């Protein structure tokens, strides 16, 4: 096959889509290039459907090869290891964008693999993977309803930029990744520095317009590859008569169940209705072995019709009756309770409860040694702020094995972390490494938003001087024709059965994090404006409830948290603190029980829960790094006697020479006539040359002391007063 290339211009830069050159045995493969960043994306789908499942078995893997940036992995085996957080999050971005576009009922195992094979240190590769996934699926025979395309939108200096460079992103106050089709925004994920709702909407619409050339390029690529026919598959059965019977037997019962407030009560009743449905159909077929056998064979189909009844009733209840599960109104938020400081030995803690969703959140303050070190294409990255989200099975009343965090947990944690990172203090004001852990105690929707709220309270309880409190709210959308309902603080059912999951986090001043997944087309600007305005009102209500527990950061950190003090020394004196083989710094940390971190610029951070120990370590460091001042008088110790003079230690590690002529104003035959080793002597610094050699004078020190009527002897190693 001759390689085929198509180019699209986005944000003033060309993006190349190429197929037919590599990975030709994949059902679809596309090479995507922006600058010198290249991502290879492949799509393969099994020939036969996977039996016995009620979901679409799609797997998306995004992987970054370190050779792409000219780096050798730092692991023992020098191979890439488990996926990094960025790889996991990018895999989720692609999955969330593409999954809703596959044909309903298609259940063949499908895998999309995006591999970064070149990285130019300027153009990020996540949006290339997103566009490449759509292109690979679009040119294949897999029943995919694309194309879509990905773009990153940033606001730099007040101007919106499509696919900004890494340098531009560092200066941006808004940074979102989004996927869009010709007429709809499909997915949004990003953060901001307290921007307004109007700015966010402009960014989303700007991004949707920016991807249109990429959609044209994908259509052109598909046409050039022969417009492969989509493979056929068995669509879901639709027995109109059986569907109507299921509805007749369950509609009123479902109506009653959705009026129950308590989650497990409601779920229990809905499960009972399903059993009653199957039993009613079996009773109707009693005595007819063939009908009974048919019901047994079609049980999965019957359950599917029952799920459709639940779906239809809940949406009708919301759009027609303007009533939600449990009787709430469209903008109503569940009851909120907050508690802080409930874990006595933890640096900061909170318990945030909203309805039947509850998060127990703890904050730990650490030192620079606790930073997370991550090897990435851009080099070694150090994270000083982390938020980890855990979703144990007991939170939803289930029994499961406890495993390491999955993609969902990593994604929820990243969303909450991004929301709070925007208000974290700069390192020079608060030099701590901060770890926030959110454990979900119970869940019925919006647990990631509970983590944001609980995380904010926990940070304030720990005394972290955040810029402003942050809250999060999950919004939903039900759209039936012209009937539209926008829901605040959605439940799990409303998320599952709705058309949009829209999470918005921020302060009273603006948005700090956003995540949106839209399952339908045609979400207009008016709908986005209404949803964001309603989210802002809900966010402010939640902030008010949080303020009842704690309205601002505590004035001091926990008694059990390390106290960090930072001092500055001359960079060339760093070696004096470290000592040969680290001997000196190890001795200081062992004697004081402190943790010491030294930066190349001479910043020295000393940490310990005991402030007295910090001061002790500072005194030792000051002693090692003091600079001799010309004209100052010091009390020193004679370390060595020579024919021409004496070497005197004026403070630890720093010696100077008293020439024999500077011992006294009288002639001295031998140095040993005046001084002996180990003797303390008052000396004055008379010069320090370029190489750092110090000349001392005893006679000038004595003369100066005689002139002072009330002079006092200085402490050893310190200047005389």
From Swiss-Prot:
It catalyses: RNA(n+1) + phosphate = RNA(n) + a ribonucleoside 5'-diphosphate. Residues 562-621 form the KH domain. Mg(2+) binds at residues 495, 501. Keywords: Cytoplasm, Magnesium, Metal-binding, Nucleotidyltransferase, RNA-binding, Transferase. Its EC number is 2.7.7.8. Residues 631-699 form the S1 motif domain. GO terms for molecular function: 3'-5'-RNA exonuclease activity; magnesium ion binding; polyribonucleotide nucleotidyltransferase activity; RNA binding. Residues 699-721 are annotated as: Disordered. One of its GO terms (cellular component) is cytosol. Gene3D superfamilies: GHMP Kinase, N-terminal domain, K Homology domain, type 1, Nucleic acid-binding proteins. Belongs to the polyribonucleotide nucleotidyltransferase family. NCBIfam families: polynuc_phos, PRK11824.1. HAMAP family: PNPase (MF_01595). Involved in mRNA degradation. Catalyzes the phosphorolysis of single-stranded polyribonucleotides processively in the 3'- to 5'-direction. This is Polyribonucleotide nucleotidyltransferase. It comes from Anaeromyxobacter sp. (strain K). The gene is pnp.
